[in-house]
Curated annotation (Swiss-Prot):
Family indicated by similarity: Belongs to the Vang family.
Transmembrane segments: 118-138, 152-172, 183-203, 223-243
Subunit and partners: Heterodimer with VANGL2. Interacts through its C-terminal region with the N-terminal half of DVL1, DVL2 and DVL3. The PDZ domain of DVL1, DVL2 and DVL3 is required for the interaction.
Stated name of the protein: Vang-like protein 1
Reported impact of residue 83 to L: In NTD; uncertain significance
Species whose genome carries this gene: Homo sapiens
Localization annotation: Cell membrane
């Protein structure tokens, strides 16, 4: 036991720390446990991985307080002196699967980019080759072509430039995500362009190269017609890839499975996989960040409620597990009448403590910012070399508010998402831009969207799309698909926007006029 120590700080997997005292037994029994069908172990181990940022006040002073926080067990991790990390066969299998998936995605990405680049070069070099091949192969046999051909050359050059810019703007954009399937319309356009260019080459080879056509003006017009057709195909691509999806046709209800938070989005004609991409892009900016620590209180309450029940068999020992389970359920139902009172008082006490610590935090931050204003007034009288930068000013006032901020983050279970380094950066940012204490506290008083936090706090970087239909199919009324990540899932329900009938009703302006008749007895 002399090699063991208790580390109190912000752990990435703090919600699993209650099981840390059983890791030794599970490690010894892991070699004896039966394997699943896919070759992975049935036991799951918890990898202890502290965040990259420095924990907020993770020193000895916070661990020796007389009054500990109620959730100290959730933010405490036991680390032995021999190893700080543990890994199971399931983790190894997951890592290998992720590596295989990444290799497959990279191959698919580079293959698609190679095919598109080759086809683009073929498209832009084909009209130029149509014009250059006859003068190279049978220059002396060609009929002279003067001003008309020169005008066609200028026209084709500008059309190729417009086509090049339009193709770059439409197709050569940075990929936002890796799709599980190909984009159907884009693949159809590539096939159409390939067949179109091949048919032009076949006609050019049979009717011009084999017969050595002498009409050079006709050859140039043939190349210009190819460029015109390519411009029309580019217009078709804009309609199919961009304009078709602009008009809203469906409403998507997105519900997070853990806490039930939901949002509604309106989309046009999209495939299921592209609709899933739009949902995920909006999820990171609209949904509050997922905090698994908020769910541990209800689980602990249910476990505590069932732990107080015990079944005794007066008839002697037996293996009737079903009867014992029924007895436990019946006893829990009888105790359910008083459990709501416990929940009410627990929530009331928690709200009281949150308000108390919020008030302390607000006062501490306001005093710190007043101190900053005083320092700024004093530094205006100093020499330029003696003035502190915003980073130094943030480090100077941070200790005065650190304790109150730490207690508030711990009672609201946000300690995993705010490291000391991130708080200092935010404080320096607020000082640089002259923000008020309320602007500084807004990030910590309420949970913000996922994009507000560091990427290592998101807990969701890779998603799996689960659907009963092919992901390349378009959206329609009643479709339900699920986006799953490691800790939670997003359930998406598709509803078609109803057809609205508007009728017009004309009101004669003269109907609003009235006559006021006054009498001697009428008081106005």
């Amino acid at each position: 036991m002399d090699t063991e120590s208790t580390y109190s700080g912000y752990s990435y997997y703090s919600s699993h720390s209650k099981k840390s005292h059983r890791q030794g037994e599970r490690t010894r029994e892991r070699h004896k446990s039966p394997r699943n069908k896919d070759g992975r172990g049935s036991e799951k181990s918890v990898t202890i991985q502290p965040p990259t940022g420095e924990p907020l006040l993770g020193n000895d002073s916070t661990r020796t307080e007389e009054v500990q926080d109620d959730n100290w067990g959730e933010t405490t991790t036991a680390i032995t002196g021999t190893s700080e990390h543990s890994i199971s066969q399931e983790d190894i299998a997951r890592i290998s699967k992720d590596m295989e998936d990444s290799v497959g995605l990279d191959c698919k990405r580079y293959l698609g980019l190679t095919v598109a680049s080759f086809l683009g070069l073929l498209v832009f070099l084909t009209p130029i080759a149509f014009i250059l091949l006859p003068p190279i192969l049978w220059r002396d046999e060609l009929e002279p072509c003067g001003t008309i051909c020169e005008g066609l050359f200028i026209s084709m050059a500008f059309k190729l430039l417009i086509l090049l810019i339009g193709t770059w703007a439409l197709f050569f954009r940075k990929r936002r995500a890796d799709m599980p399937r190909v984009f159907v319309f884009r693949a159809l356009l590539l096939v159409l362009i390939f067949l179109f260019v091949v048919s032009y080459w076949l006609f050019y080879g049979v009717r011009i190269l084999d017969s050595r056509d002498r009409n050079y003006q006709g050859i140039v017009q043939y190349a210009v017609s190819l460029v015109d057709a390519l411009l029309f195909i580019h217009y078709l691509a804009i309609v199919l890839l961009e304009l078709r999806q602009l008009q809203p046709m469906f409403t998507l209800q997105v519900v997070r499975s853990t806490d039930g938070e939901s949002r509604f989005y309106s989309l046009g004609h999209l495939s299921i996989q592209r609709a899933a991409l739009v949902v995920l892009e909006n999820y990171y900016k609209d949904f509050t960040i997922y905090n698994p620590n908020l769910l541990t209180a209800s689980k602990f309450r249910a476990a505590k409620h069932m732990a107080g029940l015990k079944v005794y068999n007066v008839d002697g020992p037996s293996n009737n597990a079903t009867g014992q389970s029924r007895a436990m359920i019946a006893a829990a139902a009888r105790r359910r009448d008083s459990s709501h009172n416990e929940l009410y008082y627990e929530e009331a006490e928690h709200e009281r403590r949150v308000k108390k610590r919020k008030a302390r935090l607000v006062v501490a931050v306001e005093e710190a910012f007043i101190h900053i204003q005083r320092l700024q007034a004093e530094e205006q009288q100093k020499a330029p070399g003696e003035v502190m930068d915003p980073r130094e000013a943030a480090q100077a006032i941070f200790p005065s508010m650190a304790r109150a901020l730490q207690k508030y983050l711990r009672i609201t279970r946000q300690q995993n998402y705010h490291s000391m380094e991130s708080i200092l950066q935010h404080l320096a940012f607020c000082i640089t831009n002259g923000m008020t204490p309320k602007a500084f506290l807004e990030r910590y008083l309420s949970a913000g969207p996922t994009l507000q936090y560091d990427k290592d706090r998101w807990l969701s970087t890779q998603w799996r799309l689960v659907s009963d239909e092919a992901v390349t199919n378009g959206l329609r009324d009643g479709i339900v698909f699920v986006l799953k990540c490691l800790d939670f899932s997003l359930v998406v329900n598709v509803k078609k926007i109803p057809f609205i009938i508007l009728s017009e009703e004309f009101i004669d302006p003269k109907s609003h006029k009235f006559v006021l008749r006054l009498q001697s007895e009428t008081s106005v």
